[in-house]
Amino acid sequence: MMDVATLLSAVKRKERTDQYVILAALFALDAHITSVTAKQIVETLQLHLGADVPTNVNASLRAYKAYVSPTDKGPPIRWSLMPKGIEHLRSVSGLALSIASDAESYRSDVGIVCALVHPELAAVMKALGGVGAWVEVGDARHAHIYRETNLSIEGGAKLRIVATTATSMGLTAAAIATTQLVLQFRPRLVAMIGIAAGTRSGDKQFGDVLVADPSVDYNSGKVVFEGGIRGFQPDPYPIGLDPRLRTVLQKYGSTHPLFGEIRQRWKSAVPSKPNRLHVGPVGAADQVIDDATLILEIQKNGRKLIGVEMETYGVYRAVYEAPEPKPRVVSFKAVCDFAAEKSDSWQEYAAFMAAEFAVEFVRREWTALWPKSQ
């Protein structure tokens, strides 16, 4: 970390604008890693400038949209220093301003990736306070829109949550969205939240939550001709859950009471049988399946398959190959149909169940996953 005195002394007194001084304080406070309040900025500057601190720092921060971003609507509002702000400081000061700590630290707690704005992201935003609880953050040069909010967990701490959607359905778009999210916000946990097709085994209901462990790209392999017949030799590279995450999830097996609590919040029709959690292999590929025979083909190579969808493997693979500090990753997708038995009537309910369960799981189990992170 570079202190404020060094940043101030790098610029002649008459050339120190209020903007430079405030950005210098943000950098010294590591606001590019952890957001800070205007009060923290003022207190830091008072140590070096005494009574010459810029007036109305909050109003100034609102005017520096290219350089800073609000991460919490407050009160108090918390502010992050954006990459453009650091570049501006470098340009004015001539200092190198190393941000190696940025590559070595988490900057947020949960990064959420959805394939669809409706119904998936809409359900996530509603589960976390509604549209009014979120603010747009991030660099506008990127294709994705990022929204941020906070989640109060058991014990009283607040988590920084960042959510985005892929630009389209499918593995490639999901992998790109996840990679960009991880590189910009460095979350401790990446969660894919949405809807999926379930398999008929295991007495699944609409709204049952599927957690991919592992996620499998079932289209990975080799097409061959044997005896004049085209065949397929699968060569998947399954990616599973972090062992600690898997263990904590096991607490919600069978018909956990949480699912009944969530169902009571839904104001329309629900399935006749209770909803529950299924943890197991989920297949992923860039195709919508509307053919029962294809499900049977996939199950030949994965008899414990619990569902199929189009994005999770891209998310898992992006996290698997992410730089350190590497996040953990999980996918919560609820059953909206049964592949060949297509119906849109349960999509809203499935998105609701996936989002509500994911949020409750994080709220209740965060300290079990990261007991020393707060």
Where are these regions (language model features)?
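Intrinsic-disorder/coil detector with helix-boundary
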Residues: 96-373
